[in-house]
Every structure is written in structure tokens, then in C-alpha cells.
Amino acid sequence: MPFAIGQRWLSESENALGLGVITALDQRTVTIYFPAADETRIYAAAQAPLSRIVFSKGETLSHQAGWQGEILDVQNMNGLLFYLVKTPQDEDVIVQERDISPIISFSQAKDRLFSAQIDRSSHFALRYRTLCHQQAQFKSPLRGLRGTRAGLIPHQLHIAAEVGNRVNPRVLLADEVGLGKTIEAGMILQNQLFAEKVQRVLIIVPETLQHQWLVEMLRRFNLHFSLFDEERCNDFDLDAVNPFMTESLIICSLNWLETHPNRVEQALDAQFDCLIVDEAHHLVWSESAPSAAYLLVEQLARIIPSVLLLTATPEQLGQESHFARLRLLDPERFFDYQTFVKEQKRYQPVVNAIESLLANKALSAVEKNHISDLLLEQDVEPLFKAIASNNDEEQHRARQELIQALIDRHGTGRMLFRNTRQGVKGFPHRVYHQITLSEENDKIDWLINFLKLHRDEKIFVICQTAATAIQLEQILREREAIRAAVFHEKMSIIERDRAAAYFADLENGAQVLLSSSIGSEGRNFQFAANLVLFDLPTNPDLLEQCIGRLDRIGQKRDVQIYVPCAKDSPQIRLARWYNEGLNAFEQTCPMGMALFSQFEDELEKVRSNSTALSENEFSELLKQTKTVREKLKIELEKGRDRLLELNSNGGKQAQALADQIADEDNSPELVNFALKLFDIIGVEQEDLGANSIVISPTGTMLVPDFPGLKEEGVTVTFDRELALAREEMEFLTWDHPMIRQGIDLVASGDIGKAAMALLVNKQLPAGTLLIELIYIVESQSPKGLQLNRFLPPTPIRLLLDNKGNNIGEQVAFETLHSKLKPLGKNIANQMVKMARGNIEALITRGDQLVKSLAEPIITEAKNQADQQLSAEINRLQALRAVNQNIRQSEIDILEQQRTQSLDELSKANWRLDCLRVIVTNKE
């Protein structure tokens, strides 16, 4: 059928878009606007997956003005349809097709049944189960949290859930090293992407961390970012195209933007929804002279709605630098440094009261006064009485209520998340082994002997350069046939993947991984617990980064750290300074770089010449370093903000969230569904044992391509622990693109839309007709409203007997399906033709019955949306009165969302999605 502007068409692959209208045409493409979803699609005219919508005489037509009427006649003029319709006021009016409502209930299942496109009964079952799973996943509070390739760390899950659910979050992530700020940022981002709150993301990082972020986003979150640099952008300059508009997920370096102001202008014009800045503490600021890098990020942060800053802890930064970060997030709130300092002091006495509440101590009069001053709008006297009572349950409830109220009103608690190792339990110990050798050349012999003594252990060796790592691999292979993998920054991501997989293989893998000091950035090897520092890192931050490859949450054993050095060498003195001065091998040292800077001149002498300092002078350096470190440590402990820690780690709620995901990990539901999905689609499965399978495409699949399935096949696992150890495997969860897109493939396609089956039942007369009808209740609304959390596509199942009675509640789906037998396609087609009149009558009956089942679902969704959005608005309005960190713009957006959401839910409708005709026989 030829296209014409103004015609109405339906997308066969995206029914939820509603009824579209052609807005533009050329020889090769057709452009269609879908008003219900406010989306535009461009299709190749020759192969457009579209269905022309033509209504017939006698059908009901819905006008975009909201009224409905019966069609009396249809006329075609130059390819456009004009309908003569009787209005509710009994008037005959002509309706052009462009005026038809974009929200349409369209039953393709019936068309497929009567046009001999009948599927197998098992395909119908897959479709119904898929629809049920789709609904459950949209409603799940774990959506966007469970799919990360990472251990279930409560504080990370808490931050991801808390920040990810906000509208346009602007926060500072300031956890200590090793607590997973990158993972937190990725989980927040994934949560926002899943909820369709953001679509376009810009990540700005130091140049050396670009590949680390690229790897982390892909391996942990299945997010495909693009690296941008000058060479890539130059390709678009000739076409006068803004390069930042060519991709949705972009990573670039801060240094590149600094040196190319024109690229900053292009980034500002690219309408990003979310900005993430790593190492934000390097953005130098003072009131009189902010740095160029700071001003650059400030420009972007002003116009991009969501901002995540990853930074060192406030204690490491100092107050002024910490204020500068907060100023990027909310310049109106944090406008003056001295005002900020005074406000912070106001909260210090409250921290002491929090300590008493946490320790179940009685509150002093002074502590009560401080709490009352901060909670002026709340009558806290009943809570104080409950705390002083003898009722343990009342005491606990009152303490928790007070703590929560204080957290909500904390000066920066809503914007700042900072966890410390002291506040987060579960870390292993670090055990330092100093290996003193006679000569520098003895290192290789020592390493070979060490590897031979620990043949059953995985050993991670860090060298200064890639060249050293490559040389060592050759020596180990040629001299002792020791299996070693090499890992360095000159390798491609795929090559590093292979090396990591070779090292991770517990049966036939490498015993040792030889890595350059920066080659392993972004990679974690918790399955190994032995670290050899063949060359010492040149500063404390690099040292912590190297140890952090093994010493992370999730490490099950104590980390053994071996440092081989020649006696009287610069390296052994540097090792002693790290150990005796900083205690940096066996503990994290937040003040390490500050001490490194303070003693930089002396350390330069140590590194360049082992005799530049006498033994007495070196001993004095160790003593001074230790003294300053202890002093700084005491100051840091005094400044501990328990209120902030409580807000950051999530407490019992965070643990409950982790437990929920663990329970889902252990459930067989996903495994059963995925294997059935692969089986019916025609994906080949090869069981590898050890909780993993290889899936490969075949020439007999029901679809041309299965999402995420490579031609050479993919190894997948449903086991979180195995996925952490084997990065080359895909970790399948309900959030994985392969599962989500597999669900979409079935739900939005034609698989199982119309089926027929035989029920052998001696108690029913032969030829008895039953029909199973699956309707979908849904809202065709703009994605940004995220109405799927209130009303996801919801299946309603009817099972009608030959008299039109719904017996679905008496006969469960799985019970019925297990008793059905397949019918040959020719027989099925003949029976449909013979019973067409009865089938049509039963479908009409189903259309009448479903209304009473669908309307309560829509009403419940409206009530849920009203309650949830109103509660959040009321909470934020109450908090804004006492905590200026609540932005009025955030409340305004929520109020707009509430009004628009209720309006869209009122327009929700239902449609027949699929059906199964069942015929009985005695045998």
C-alpha cells in the first residue's frame, strides 16, 4: 500500500507507541510521529514493520477529542481515509483519519488466527509467561540494582537505591579507597537509565582512567560507552556535526576538554541529562582564583540536571576544597564559604548525641537541647520519654525515629555520601612480608622459587613497566615452564579480557598474572590473595591502588603482600617508609599523599640514592612521619561524622536489600525461564558444568537475531560468584540486556500470539471448544513519567468455556498447559475455519468480561501513583522547611509529574494480546 502524509499506521514491533501518523516522506524513508508516546521513528519505506490502520463500517472509532462513535461509511481520497461517524449526540460527522485518537486497542491475535498464522501451544505458553515476568520485573524494587557484576555490598546498594530513585540527583560520592565509588556511580546511572530518567550521559575522568571506566561500565553494567578524543571529533567537523550528538553514552578526559574550548561549547549544546566527574578533588578552587578545570565543570554542571561527583573523602580534601565540590552541585545553596563553616559547626554537638543514641546510652540534658534545637518543628518530648522508659521495644523505636529525623535534616546528608572502612565491615587483613635480598638481580630467582613453593596459589605480580612484565613472562616460561599471563596498558581491552580469564581459570589457567602498575586499573582479582610488588609504586595513592586490586570488599582471605628488595637499596628504604612511617601496607592511609607531599624533598633523596640520607637521618624521617600520621589520624577520628555515616551505609535497610537480591539470585525462576526462552527461540545450548552454559545461534531460530548473541556463541552464567571470578562470562540476571531484550522480543513480536491445542478429556464431549484470552492493560504515555512502576503492561487471563463462562480462576494456567497436546498446523487451520463463528462470539464475550477486570487494575495504579508521589512531595516540602538542601525545583518537578501521571493513567486502556483455542477429544 503506498504511503501518504496524514495516514495512520501502527508499529508492528512497538505496539505500545500507539497509533502513528506519517509526517514526512521521501523515496527511501517514511517518518512517523506517535502522539501517545511523544516519539518519532524513521523507517526504510521498502521494509517498514508497519500495519496500515483501516477501520470498517460498524466498528467503533475513537476521536482525539475524547468521544467515540459508530462508523457508518468509509471513503478513500488520494490515499487518505475519511469516516462518516455517528457522534454520541446522534449527529453524522466526517472524521479525517488524522483526527483519530492515538491511543488504540488493536487485536492482532484474532487476525493471525483467522489468516492461518497459528503458533504452537508451547509458544503461547512462553508468551504468557514472558508477559507475567515482564510485569513482575517492572514492579520489582530490585530493578536496576541486581544486575551489576559485583558482590552484594549493602552500602553500595543503599546509595544506588536512595540516589537512583531521585529526580535529577546531584550528589557527592566520597567513600574511602576500596569501597567502590565507581560501582556506586554505575549503579545509580543504571537505575536512572532503567527508569528512563536519563538517556544521555557524559563521564569526565582523568586521561589515565578513561579505559578503566570504559571497562567498568561494560563489564559490570553492560553499558556501551564511547571514548571521545580530538581525532574522533575531527571526523565530524567537515560535516558541521556536533560530535557529542552522535552518541548517548560518552567518556572523555578532563585534560582534552581543557585544551579544546570548542569541544566544551559542543558538550554544552549536546543536551546531556547526566554528568559524572571522577577524581573531582583535583578541580582546584579558591574564592579569588578558581582553576580553568573547575570553571569548565561548573559550566557543564549548571545546565546538566543530574550530577555525580566522585571525590576523595572530605577529611582528605579539607573544608574549603570540600565546599568547592558542594558548590558545583548547588551554587545557590553553597554561595559563601564562611557561612558553610558556621553551619557545619552547628551540627557537631548533634554528632555527640547520635553517638549516645547508637550506644543505647541515656541522653544528657545538653544533648536533648541540641536535638530539640535542630528539630524545632517536631515535638520530640514523647520520644525522649520513650527512650527513658523501661520498654525495650519503645526505646528502640524512639531512638530509630530520632536518628532518622536527624539524618533527614543533616546539613549535607542528602547531597553527600561517604563511607569509611571503619564504618563498613567485612574487610580481610593485610599481611606485609619484607623480602631482603643481597642483590637487585636476585629478584627474579626469588620470584621463581616463590612461585614453585606456591604452585597451588594464584599470584598477582605488579611491575613498574609493561616491558618488565613482558620480560618476566618470557623468563618464567623458558626457565621453569610456569604459566603466566601478562597485563599492561598497551594491550587492547579484548587482550586484557583474555589474560584475565586465563588467570581466573582455576583448573587450566595461569598461576601468575604479571601486570604493569597502571595496566590493571579497573580490574579486580579477589579470587587471588597473594600480591608481589616486584617494583614499588612511586607514591602512596598508587600503592593503595595496587593493593586494592586484591584488597576489596568480597575478598575472602587475608591479603599477603610480598616486597622483594635488595639490601641498602633506595627501594628498601621506600618500603620501610611506606611500612614504618605510613603503615600503608597493612592498613589504608587516607593521609598518605598529604604526608608524601610534606616529606617530598627527603623522599626524593631516598628514591634517587640510598646513601643520600644517613641511617640516623632516615630513622628521624620515619619517626617524624609516624608522629605526624598519628596526629592526623586522631584529628580524622575526632571529625568522624556518624550522622553522615549512618545516612551513607543504610544500616539494616541496606542489609535487607542485599538479602532480597541474594534470595533472587538463588531462585530457579530466571534459570527456568531463560532456558525455556532459548529452547523455543531455537538458541543452541551446551552445558559446560560449573553453573555455566554456551549459547549459540542456529539457522532455525524463530527470529533473525537474538539480542546480545554473537555468531561465535556466548558463555553465560547465572551464578554471581562465578561471574565475579570469570569476567569473560556474561552474568545473566533479570536486568541483563539479553534477558530484558529477550522479553521485549517475545512481548512486542508475534511469537505465540495465536495458538491451538488439543485437550484429551474423557469427561467432556468431543469437540468442546474452550478459548484462552490474554489481555494487556497498559498506559501509552511518555517514557519520562515512568508509569510502568505503577501500571506495567499487565496480563489478564480469561478461560472461556463454550457457553462464555470465565473458568480461569478454577483452572490454573500451568495445570491446563501441562494437559494439552499439540495439533498439526493443517488440522488446526481446518478446525479454526469450522469454528470461526463460535470463536468470534467467544472473543466478543471476552471483550465484554475483561472491562470489569481491567478497570480495578487501572484504579489501583492511579491510587498507588497518587499516594506515592503525594507522599514524596509532602515529605520533601516538610524537609525543605528545615533543610535547605532540598531543592524547590525537585518538588516542582514531582508535582508536575503527579498531575501528568494521573492524567495519563486515566487514559489507560487494554487490548487482546494473544489467544489459544482449545478443542477437546476423548483420546
UniProtKB/Swiss-Prot annotation:
CDD domains: DEXDc_RapA, SF2_C_SNF. Belongs to the SNF2/RAD54 helicase family. RapA subfamily. Keywords: Activator, ATP-binding, DNA-binding, Helicase, Hydrolase, Nucleotide-binding, Transcription, Transcription regulation. Its EC number is 3.6.4.-. NCBIfam families: PRK04914.1. Residues 162-332 form the Helicase ATP-binding domain. A motif (DEAH box) lies at residues 278-281. Signal peptide: none annotated. The keyword Signal does not apply. Interacts with the RNAP. Has a higher affinity for the core RNAP than for the holoenzyme. Its ATPase activity is stimulated by binding to RNAP. This is RNA polymerase-associated protein RapA. The keyword ATP-binding applies. It comes from Haemophilus influenzae (strain 86-028NP). Transcription regulator that activates transcription by stimulating RNA polymerase (RNAP) recycling in case of stress conditions such as supercoiled DNA or high salt concentrations. Probably acts by releasing the RNAP, when it is trapped or immobilized on tightly supercoiled DNA. Does not activate transcription on linear DNA. Probably not involved in DNA repair. GO terms for molecular function: ATP binding; DNA binding; helicase activity; hydrolase activity, acting on acid anhydrides. Residues 443-597 form the Helicase C-terminal domain. The lineage of its organism: Bacteria, Pseudomonadati, Pseudomonadota, Gammaproteobacteria, Pasteurellales. ATP binds at residues 175-182. SUPFAM superfamilies: P-loop containing nucleoside triphosphate hydrolases. GO terms for biological process: regulation of DNA-templated transcription.
